[in-house]
């Protein structure tokens, strides 16, 4: 198995000067973006200890101040997110994410004599051009908002999808490849959502000699090859299962599809895919070619394959979790250990026009980290006389490793109450 690493420009031009002082030389098919909302630039952050001062990405040390910038009004990367950079769960062979990645690699290695190149160490810090423009995300798309995406500066983001590397790899002459990596999105808090998760992108380019003589046009040829490939992958992972294709829309493929399988008496969406929009190929000097692409979320599939009930488990270092995957193989079913009791706390406040739930979740997560299991809106009403709207959220605190004390939870809740007033311009009730 050959895994490649390609050097790429990981910061925007606006960031280069800052990085040089530290020794630097210079779409998504999965999990649709949340709805658009206004964003209130973050105020000066309180440091919460311990704080990671630097991380290693592809052999390059990146300092905290390169990514978490209190003096930049467009920067919305908290320390809790910076600490996840460089952890690369997908490169751990005895971790559920790494096990699943390797199983997918095995499928492609076994079924394609013309091997797919593998890239899994590309920096998650990319330009807005790479993350949005190169994959045809419209200028007014909600995914570009500060409410949905982590911005390092106005031209640099933490990638929202592994598709951010697609154009760069095509321009460098790669035509069949798999890209795996950690991706970042501001999101809600519950058992299936986390601001950092892992994706795999697959891409395959065809030349005219591939489809000439088949009796099919280039688009149909690519679409049929894509479906054959992914149906085989689904059988490789899930066994003999019923499947169905659903037509859908992505800005970077046409036609576009979702593959669903009938698993445990329900239809499960496995991945999104499609025939690549011709303009993407043309911009990479491949105007005479056709291609297909797919993207899948590794956590989503791993939770199903390994029976993992909460996405936070993937980040756990508890031996009761990690030891269950020591063989590095599919087929293991997670055996839950004692589930510690939840602690419920409610918070109510009058919201402003700039309020968004993603911003609120970021505040809660920044304080409680993985001790918060869920944040849920349980009530809202509008006072017509005052012209104000109130939201009431229930925060569920629960550790996966120990029982939380009342004192701990009360302290966390108190900090949440203080911070939401300072950062979100809301009035507590």
UniProtKB/Swiss-Prot annotation:
Annotated keywords: Acetylation, Aminoacyl-tRNA synthetase, ATP-binding, Chloroplast, Ligase, Mitochondrion, Nucleotide-binding, Plastid, Protein biosynthesis, Transit peptide
Pfam family, one: tRNA-synt_2d
Listed EC numbers: 6.1.1.20
Residues noted as binding substrate in the record, renumbered to the chain: 163-166, 185, 192-194, 199-201, 269, 294
Superkingdom per UniProt: Eukaryota
Cellular component per GO, a single term: chloroplast
Assembly notes: Monomer.
Protein function: Is responsible for the charging of tRNA(Phe) with phenylalanine in mitochondrial translation.
Protein's name according to its UniProt entry: Phenylalanine--tRNA ligase, chloroplastic/mitochondrial
Originating organism: Arabidopsis thaliana (Mouse-ear cress)
């Amino acid at each position: 198995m050959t895994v490649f690493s390609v050097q790429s420009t990981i910061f925007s031009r606006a960031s280069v000067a800052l990085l040089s002082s530290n020794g630097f030389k210079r779409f998504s098919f999965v999990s649709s973006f949340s709805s658009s909302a206004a964003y209130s630039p973050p105020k000066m952050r309180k440091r919460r200890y311990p704080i990671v001062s630097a991380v290693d990405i592809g052999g390059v040390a990146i300092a905290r101040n390169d990514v978490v910038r209190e003096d930049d009004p467009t920067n919305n990367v908290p320390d809790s997110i910076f600490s996840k950079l460089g952890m690369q769960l997908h490169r751990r062979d005895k971790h559920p994410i790494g096990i699943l990645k390797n199983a997918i690699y095995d499928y492609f290695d076994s079924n394609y004599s013309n091997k797919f190149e593998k890239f899994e160490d590309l920096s998650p810090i990319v330009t807005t051009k790479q993350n949005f423009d190169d994959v045809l995300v419209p200028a007014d798309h909600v995914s570009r908002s500060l409410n949905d995406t982590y911005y390092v500066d106005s031209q640099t983001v933490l990638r929202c999808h592994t598709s951010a590397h697609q154009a760069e790899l095509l321009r460098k002459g790669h035509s069949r490849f798999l890209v795996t990596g950690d991706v970042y999105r501001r999101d809600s808090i519950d058992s299936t959502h986390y601001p950092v998760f892992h994706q795999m992108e697959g891409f395959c380019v065809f030349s005219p000699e591939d489809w000439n003589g088949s009796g099919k046009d280039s688009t149909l040829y690519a679409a049929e090859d894509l479906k054959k490939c992914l149906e085989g992958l689904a059988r490789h992972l899930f066994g003999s299962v019923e499947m169905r294709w659903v037509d859908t829309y992505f800005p970077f493929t046409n036609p576009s599809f979702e593959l669903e399988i009938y698993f445990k008496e329900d239809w499960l969406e496995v991945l999104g895919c499609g025939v690549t929009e011709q303009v993407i190929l043309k911009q990479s000097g491949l105007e005479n070619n056709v291609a297909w692409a797919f993207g899948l979320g590794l956590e989503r599939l791993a939770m199903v394959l390994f029976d993992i009930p909460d996405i936070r488990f993937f980040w756990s270092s508890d031996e009761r979790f990690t030891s269950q995957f020591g063989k590095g193989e599919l087929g293991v079913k997670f055996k839950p250990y004692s589930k510690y009791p939840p602690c419920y706390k409610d918070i109510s406040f009058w919201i402003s026009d700039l309020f968004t739930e993603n911003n609120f979740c970021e505040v809660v997560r920044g304080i409680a980290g993985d001790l918060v299991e869920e944040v849920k809106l349980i009530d809202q009403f509008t006072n017509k006389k005052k012209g104000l709207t109130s939201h009431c959220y229930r925060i569920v605190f629960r550790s996966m490793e120990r029982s939380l004390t009342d004192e701990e939870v009360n302290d966390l809740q108190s900090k949440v109450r203080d911070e939401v007033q300072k950062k979100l311009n809301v009035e507590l009730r």
